[in-house]
Design a protein with these regions (language model features):
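NTP-dependent nucleotidyl-transfer catalytic core
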Residues: 1-194
Length: 194
C-alpha cells in the first residue's frame, strides 16, 4: 500500500485551476487515430458480467480519448465464427429438421425471416455445447457443419446470417441500455477472407 498526505489547500487550488482550464488542463498536441476493441460478445449467447465490465471500461476509454481530441474507432469484435456456429446449426437441425436449410435438394431462395428467436438461440447454444461433450457423433457433425459454413456452404451461410441479424439486434438493444455504442460491428468472421 502507498501512504500519501496531500495538503488540502494545494489540492483545492489544483482542482480549481483544472476546472477553469480549457479541457480541464489536458492538452493533446498531436491527435491520433485510435482503434479500441471492446465488448467481445458472442453471438447467440446472452451477455455476462465480463462483457458488461469490458463494455463499460472500453466506452469510458473511448469517451476520454475523444475528449482529448483523438479520433477513436470503436469495435465490438463479435465472437461469430468457429465451432459455436457448427454446434448451433447442428442442434437447430436436430430440433427443426424440416427447415429448407437442411434439405440438400432445395434450390430456392432462403427465407428472409429467421427460423428462431433470440430466446431460442440463447437456449440452443448451451444445450448443443453440453450435448457435444457427451455425444461424439453430435460433436463430429458439429465440426462438419463448422467446416461447411467456413467453406461457404450456402444453406449454412443463410442460417449464420440469421444468427447474426437476430443476435446483433439484441446486442445493440442491450448495449444501448448501458449507453455503450460501437462504430464497427466486426467479428471473427470478417477475417475469413484472409
Amino acid at each position: 500500500s502507498i501512504n500519501i498526505k496531500l495538503n488540502s489547500e494545494f489540492v483545492a487550488k489544483y482542482l480549481n485551476d483544472m476546472k477553469e482550464a480549457d479541457k480541464y488542463g489536458c492538452e493533446n498536441k498531436a491527435p491520433e487515430t485510435i482503434v479500441i476493441d471492446y465488448g467481445g460478445a458472442n453471438v447467440a449467447k446472452p451477455l455476462h458480467v465480463g462483457h458488461l465490465r469490458s463494455a463499460v471500461i472500453g466506452e469510458s476509454v473511448k469517451r476520454i480519448e475523444r475528449f482529448m481530441g483523438n479520433k477513436v474507432i470503436s469495435d465490438v469484435h463479435l465472437g461469430d465464427w468457429g465451432l459455436q456456429m457448427g454446434l448451433i446449426i447442428t442442434e437447430l437441425e436436430c430440433r427443426k429438421p424440416d427447415l429448407v436449410y437442411f434439405d440438400e435438394s432445395y434450390t430456392g431462395e432462403y427465407p428472409e425471416e429467421a427460423p428462431f428467436t433470440i430466446s431460442e438461440l440463447e437456449e440452443i447454444y448451451p444445450c448443443a455445447s453440453a450435448k457435444s461433450k457427451v455425444d461424439e457423433e453430435f460433436k463430429e457433425k458439429a465440426h462438419q457443419a463448422t467446416l461447411k459454413l467456413q467453406s461457404g456452404y450456402a444453406p449454412y451461410t443463410a442460417i449464420w446470417k440469421h444468427i447474426m441479424k437476430v443476435s446483433v439486434e439484441d446486442l445493440k438493444k442491450n448495449y444501448g441500455n448501458l449507453n455503450v455504442d460501437f462504430d464497427l460491428w466486426k467479428g471473427e468472421s470478417d477475417a475469413q477472407p484472409y
